[in-house]
Amino acid sequence: AHAEMMIYPRILALAEVAWSAPSVKNYDDFHVRALKEVEALKAEGYHPFDLKNEIGNRPGADQPVQHLAVGKKVAYGPDPAYYPGYSAGGDSALVDGVIGGWTYGDRRWQGFIDKKRMDVTIDMEKETEIHSVGADFMQVCGPEVFMPSEVIISVSNDGKEFTELKRMEHKVVKDDKVTFINFGWEGNAKARYIRYQAS
């Protein structure tokens, strides 16, 4: 068992490095594929090193991230909220300080189905100096996990009238790469409510 743990998945990494052209090498993509291969090896009775416990270069995946919105109330709507199968812990998932790992299967990613818009409003409880707002998104085309094509970030003091801080358009390219993108805004604003929309 120890020899298997030393060999797998290192041999997968060796094959990836040796047989892939430099122009197509992508660690993030390899890591997600390796996680699936490790699960397949386990199912076959092998004892590979558990990559899920590896601390890679996804910052915050191994420990909570501190920010001003941690623990604040999040309202979803008016469209239906996240898909129940990918709730990532429910209504507080977006403000719990925990960042999703390398795969949507880690139960840390919140998923939204079809054309339904992600529309969340965070109540900071009082007027607050805001300098950045952002959210990470993952794309894995095989299981139809896609990036948003548009993101809008706005703020408000009354929760009714919102001022747009940033609107981002994104062309969704459907390929076999696993991709992570943070859609965010940086600047200076003062508000009680932060609204984040993605579709």
Regions found by a protein language model. Give the residues of each.
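Substrate-binding groove of N-acetylhexosamine-processing glycoside hydrolases
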Residues: 1-74, 79, 191
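Hydrophobic, well-ordered secondary-structure elements that form the walls
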Residues: 11, 133, 196
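Flexible loop residues that form catalytic
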Residues: 16, 138, 199
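Short beta-strand elements bearing conserved aromatic residues within extracellular beta-rich modules
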Residues: 151-153
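Beta-sandwich interaction modules
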Residues: 168-199
